[in-house]
From Swiss-Prot:
EC number per UniProt: 2.1.1.222, 2.1.1.64
Protein name: Ubiquinone biosynthesis O-methyltransferase
Chain residues that bind S-adenosyl-L-methionine: R44, G64, D85, M129
Organism of provenance: Escherichia coli O127:H6 (strain E2348/69 / EPEC)
Enzyme class: transferase
Primary gene name: ubiG
């Protein structure tokens, strides 16, 4: 497993990276700042595995892997997983946790654009979860993901819709009222409307296959997937 440093790339927001570097040591604390990620991970994993026809024996790339929550769970499903992130500290946490868990994941500090220049068409599945809203040029990430997946392979994106409801739920509610995530985690101006994401997808070799919303019920304190993409949503695409 590696956590290699790489040259600075244009599509990096160092303020965004610093946010996650500051709390990286608590990435695997089930009651800490990343509790929501742990809570929704089974939903994400189930959606990805079902839509991709299983993960066993497949070569998978997790773009913006952070501390490795999704990457590890996909490796447990029998996938050969590479995790990309530009945060050095989150990758160190991911690397150590994988060692402790006996899980093999290859962690690399590199942008997805740099990775695509070297490994085009190498992956059966590419995942990019809650990462697009943290980079200056999300369309560039979509292009790179399309380049990295094999013909017929699957690419999954998740992000936040940009509207008043998502601001109330993801920023006011999650950060300030319920304190589910650290204040300042999200910038509503960087949220992405589904039509925008689909427009970027249409300019690549990817084709939309399915879209679903991720919903939180504060009364029951539960998450579920279902219709409605007005706040969090996931998109399944496939390389033509």
């Amino acid at each position: 497993m590696n956590a290699e440093k790489s040259p600075v790339n244009h599509n990096v927001d160092h303020e965004e990276i610093a946010k996650f570097e500051a709390v990286a040591s608590r990435w695997w604390d089930l009651e800490g700042e990343f509790k929501p990620l742990h809570r929704i991970n089974p939903l994400r994993l189930g959606y990805i595995a079902e839509r991709a026809g299983g993960l066993f024996g497949k070569k998978v790339l997790d773009v913006g892997c952070g501390g490795g929550i999704l990457a590890e769970s996909m490796a447990r499903e029998g996938a050969t997983v590479t995790g990309l992130d530009m945060g050095f500290e989150p990758l160190q946490v991911a690397k150590l946790h994988a060692l402790e868990s006996g899980i093999q994941v290859d962690y690399v500090q590199e942008t997805v654009e740099e990775h695509a220049a070297k490994y085009a068409g190498q992956y059966d599945v590419v995942t990019c979860m809650e990462m697009l809203e943290h980079v200056p040029d999300p369309q560039s990430v979509v292009r790179a993901c399309a380049q990295l997946v094999k013909p017929g392979g699957d690419v999954f994106f998740s992000t936040l819709n940009r509207n008043g409801k998502s601001w109330l739920m993801a920023v006011v509610g999650a950060e300030y009222i319920l304190r589910m995530v650290p204040k300042g985690t999200h910038d509503v101006k960087k949220f992405i409307k589904p039509a925008e994401l689909l427009g970027w997808v249409d300019q690549t070799s990817l084709k939309e296959r399915h879209m679903t919303g991720l919903h939180y019920n504060p009364i029951t304190n539960t998450f579920k997937l279902g219709p409605g993409v007005d706040v969090n949503y996931m998109l399944h695409t496939q390389n033509k």
